[in-house]
Design a protein with these regions (language model features):
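N-terminal leader/auxiliary helical segments
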Residues: 1-83, 88-202
Length: 202
């Protein structure tokens, strides 16, 4: 996806997640969403699931199992969350997959069309959504398995721009929601521990 498409996705997520702490650091979130395209490695490493999945996993760990919960949601947290959305969105962009056999020019033409279609798609009323009230994922392993499973399903679908839009929004929204839910659950446990309330009461 092009940078403007990543920003469109980041704004959609910000508006639909409705997380106050995330909104306070939205600039860091937006920067993170385009950061992988601003690094020198962008010229040598494709943003495909085959090339960058280990990087994605490390990014997820940075704001889950390896994160200092006492800091709360910070600019660091939001920047890395933005980076996660970038890699995920690219995995579900047709030219970023090995099954794409087109030229660089065809790659650029596809992403240009995606830019305009995606901008309209995230503004449609039917695309808006609410956060999951019951935790669907309880660990990063479950999140990772979900990403892999969904990508396999994606590879078997018709490769058209609208399909990309739907997969990108659905997958990225669910993953970001899951990461935030893990954060919120860990914060609740930390607060209860600080208040000396037994964890068993959760």
């Amino acid at each position: 996806m092009r940078k403007k498409s990543h920003i469109s996705l980041a704004k959609f997520l910000m508006n639909n997640m409705k997380v106050e702490d995330l909104n306070e650091h939205k600039k860091a979130f937006y920067i993170g969403s385009i950061l992988p395209d601003c690094r020198p490695s962008f010229l040598t490493r494709k943003h495909s699931i085959d090339a960058t999945f280990p990087i994605l996993i490390e990014e997820i760990k940075k704001i889950t199992v390896d994160y200092d919960m006492e800091q709360g949601i910070t600019g660091y947290y939001c920047r890395h969350l933005g980076v996660i959305t970038h890699y995920l969105a690219d995995y579900f962009t047709f030219p970023h997959n090995s099954i794409f056999q087109g030229s660089i020019k065809e790659h650029c033409v596809y992403e240009k069309k995606l830019k305009f279609t995606f901008k309209s798609y995230v503004q449609e009323e039917d695309t808006q959504r609410d956060r999951e009230q019951k935790g669907t994922f309880h660990s990063i392993d479950e999140i990772i398995r979900f990403i892999v499973k969904t990508h396999r399903e994606y590879l078997m679908t018709l490769k058209v721009v609208k399909e990309d839009c739907q997969f990108i929004v659905d997958l990225v929204y669910k993953v970001v929601d899951a990461i935030l839910q893990i954060f919120e659950l860990n914060m609740m446990k930390l607060n209860m521990k600080n208040e000396q309330i037994p964890i068993e009461c959760l």
